[in-house]
Amino acid sequence: MPRKPKAAATPACKPAAPASTPAFWLFKSEPDSFSWEQQKARGKKGEAWEGVRNFLARSNMKAMRLGDRGFFYHSNVGKEIVGIVEVCALAHPDASDATGVWKCVDVRALADMPKPVSLVAVKANRKLANMVLVRSSRLSVQPVTPAEWAEVCRMGGLDPASI
């Protein structure tokens, strides 16, 4: 049986043609493996969000559009939203997956969260009671509603209209 070809190199982030209405997401990362500081160090080029092995998270990434925004969440250590990222390359093969089943998007850092928003604070806010982070906290790439986006930005000291 022939071997599968290697996954293509990660596409470079393209200048985003802003979607008419961007969607919002939350990306979880263990800071010991890949931190917000490392994400920021990638600059405008961004970084492939590789290694996700959950079908719902994969579907979420396949639904993303250029210019969509996301929260960068430190899981396990810190458990807080620390920054804002932008989707800068659409779903493509995950180079860390030899099977070709898994996809990833590329994201680049846009802004620090002036006041990191802890999981405890999110859970304590009644406006966020239905947020996926509260209801299904293990999902590594999850949708965020526009109302949740605005509320978390407010909690973190950001004007959602400026992001």
Task: Give the role of each language-model region.
Residues 73-79:
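Short, charged beta-turn/beta-strand-edge "cap" motif at the junction between a beta-strand
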Residues 82-142:
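Aromatic- and Lys/Arg-enriched surface recognition patch
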Residues 32-34, 114, 151:
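Short, acidic Gly/Pro/Ser/Thr-rich loop/turn segments
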Residues 146-163:
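Charged phosphate-binding loop/patch that engages nucleotide di/tri-phosphates or the phosphate backbone
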Residues 1-66, 159-162:
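Compositionally biased, charged N-terminal/linker segments
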Residues 28-30, 110, 144:
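Structured loops at beta-to-helix junctions and adjacent beta-edge loops in soluble globular domains
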Residues 38, 116-122, 153-155:
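Short, charged, solvent-exposed linker or helix-capping segments at domain edges/interfaces
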